[in-house]
């Protein structure tokens, strides 16, 4: 999208890596020669500083806002942004696309007329790996359609599109229950971990998260130790060293856990597993890990697909 909609004389505002923004965005913009500055951010609330942002939007200096958050427990509220007609938004919803589709989170396309919503299918929207581009602006649509194919992509695969459509139909039928459970489990797990002594990021609404993610805040040494111990038992986590995590911590996503339709007792077992990892208790790690592996049966999916 950036290659199709931006020129090297343009300036944009972005969510930076320290704010949870994807690390690739500054690199891409630098390669394109596009000037960028940070979107004002309130780290205490894990949220955009809308007053400062709206003041910057009034300046007329910027062509786009680019939201590209990989670490996100409190999504931006697009309805609070006062955007002049001369500006647009590129909203990378890769992490939350499934939550948006199910109505768990607000759909950015419904609040501002000149916006491009992009995302990948490997997070909360389970589907064959691919990207999706949506816009409510005919001008952006024409630029994207003209530039992306054939300038950047020439290998459209019909079988890939068919598989994506089946996955989207699956979410249309089963996604609302699945996506709501994803956020519910994230908050349940955060609460259980908090009771076990973990320092979990918490929002002022008394929730831990509005998404599938929760943040465990640790110092750098403990973060690296926790991550490595988990990896030793083939347990995948994301370690972070950035200001959003008070400098260091672990990010956990619950989208795959929710896909197994785990109940509260299963979530409590998962919390105990993470507690055992923290304390290097090999006996408990193996016990809870093996019990949870037996519960990994996919749900929220069609048992049979017949094409007539």
Protein language model features and the residues they cover:
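Conserved PLP-enzyme active-site core in the AAT-like
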Residues: 1-199, 247, 255, 260
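Generic structural signal for hydrophobic core residues of well-folded globular domains
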Residues: 5, 167-171, 218, 274-281
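PLP-dependent enzyme catalytic core of the Aspartate aminotransferase-like
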Residues: 54-55, 184, 246-308
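Short hydrophobic/aromatic beta-strand micro-patches
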Residues: 134, 215-219, 253-255
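A common structural junction motif
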Residues: 152, 233-237, 278
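Flexible, glycine/charged-enriched surface loops at secondary-structure junctions
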Residues: 155-158, 175-181, 193-206, 240-242, ...
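Conserved small-domain helix->loop->beta segment predominantly found in fold-type I
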Residues: 168, 179, 183-249
């Amino acid at each position: 999208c950036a290659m199709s909609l931006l020129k090297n004389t343009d300036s944009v505002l972005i969510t930076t890596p320290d704010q949870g923004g994807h690390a690739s965005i500054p690199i891409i913009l630098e390669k394109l020669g596009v000037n960028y500055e940070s979107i004002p951010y309130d780290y205490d609330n894990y949220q955009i500083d809308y007053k400062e942002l709206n003041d910057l939007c009034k300046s007329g200096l910027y062509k786009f806002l680019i939201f590209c958050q990989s670490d996100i427990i409190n999504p931006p509220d697009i309805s609070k942004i006062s955007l002049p007609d001369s500006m647009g938004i590129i909203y990378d919803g890769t992490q939350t696309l499934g939550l948006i589709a199910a109505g768990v989170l607000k759909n950015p396309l419904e609040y501002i007329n000149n916006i491009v919503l992009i995302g990948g299918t490997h997070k909360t929207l389970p589907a064959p790996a691919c990207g999706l581009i949506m816009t409510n602006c005919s001008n952006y649509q024409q630029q994207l359609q003209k530039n992306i194919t054939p300038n950047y992509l020439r290998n459209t695969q019909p079988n890939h599109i068919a598989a994506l459509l089946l996955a989207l139909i699956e979410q249309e039928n089963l996604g609302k229950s699945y996506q709501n459970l994803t956020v519910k489990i994230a908050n349940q797990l955060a609460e259980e971990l908090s009771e076990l002594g973990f320092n979990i990021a918490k929002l002022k609404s008394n929730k831990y998260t509005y998404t599938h993610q929760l943040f465990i805040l640790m110092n750098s040494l403990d973060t690296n130790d926790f991550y490595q111990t988990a990896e030793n038992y083939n347990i995948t986590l994301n370690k972070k060293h950035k200001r959003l995590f008070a400098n260091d911590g672990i990010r956990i996503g619950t989208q795959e856990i929710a896909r197994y339709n785990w109940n509260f007792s299963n979530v409590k077992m998962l919390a105990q597993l993470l507690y055992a990892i923290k304390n290097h208790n090999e006996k408990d790690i193996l016990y809870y890990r093996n019990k949870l592996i037996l519960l990994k049966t996919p749900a929220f999916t069609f048992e049979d697909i017949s094409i007539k």
